[in-house]
Amino acid sequence: MKKRTFAVDIDGTITENGGGRIHLDALESLRRLVNMGHDVIFVTGRSSVEGFLLSVFGGTTKVSVGENGGCITLDSNDHILLGNLEECKNALNILKNNMENVEEKYVFPRMTEVVLQRTFDLDQARKILSENNIDVVLSDSQYAYHINSPGIDKGTGFTEIMKKFSISRDDVIAIGDSATDVPLFKVAKTSVALGNASDDVKSEATMTVSAHAGDGVLEALDKLAPILSEI
């Protein structure tokens, strides 16, 4: 069996009902992959600590990429910070001073990004930041809006993992559902967009499934079975 590394989003991918509740059958299937000798690494817009804790309790590989690539957690007190929180906070202040309904989302503490409620026009916000010469990334994970440092995304974050653990692109399988997962798709040879993904996201994946979220992960793993059986 050839070892593969699965880079898996959390919200909208292994959750159900939109509230962050884990789809247990999907998690069980991911744990089974680990038991078979593969790696399963969560790559999320949530904090890397949340992703790491899910890996501990869920029985997957104990590494996580969080904050849309801005932070990597390798252990309880071992974090690699790739983003700059202060420049994200500065962007937040600019938006608050120039737009209405810009509100932070109540989330677990972040080390490299700012997380916002999805209560304002994203394109208008990007225009305001550009006019003020603020160079950050403003993205929509469907879970929230995120302000990240320039050059930070799930793809760059996971690339650090690939370098650290000598993982080949040919052995990476990415699974996700939102625009923030597209950079992750680009660093993986195989990528799967779930049924709840937009058409734009689906067009960036090498494979799509019809089922949504956790059910989509189960469908994806069924489709990937021939690849996983390769020697």
From Swiss-Prot:
Q: What is this protein called?
A: Phosphoglycolate phosphatase
- Record carries keyword Magnesium: yes
Q: Where is the active site?
A: D9
List of residues binding Mg(2+): D9, D11, D177, D181
Name the coenzymes or cofactors required. Answer: Mg(2+)
Q: Which domain of life is it from?
A: Archaea
Keyword Metal-binding assigned to the entry: answer is yes
Tell me a GO cellular component: cytosol
* Residue sites binding substrate per the record: K154
UniProt source species = Nitrosopumilus maritimus (strain SCM1)
Please state what class of enzyme this protein is: hydrolase
Catalytic activity, as annotated:
2-phosphoglycolate + H2O = glycolate + phosphate
* Keywords recorded for this protein, A-Z: Carbohydrate metabolism, Hydrolase, Magnesium, Metal-binding
Family, according to the entry, reads as follows: Belongs to the archaeal SPP-like hydrolase family.
One example of the protein's molecular function in GO is: phosphoglycolate phosphatase activity
What is this enzyme's EC?
A: 3.1.3.18
Which Pfam family would be a valid example here? Answer: Hydrolase_3
Function of this protein? Catalyzes the dephosphorylation of 2-phosphoglycolate.
NCBIfam families per the UniProt record, alphabetical: HAD-SF-IIB, Pglycolate_arch, SPP-subfamily
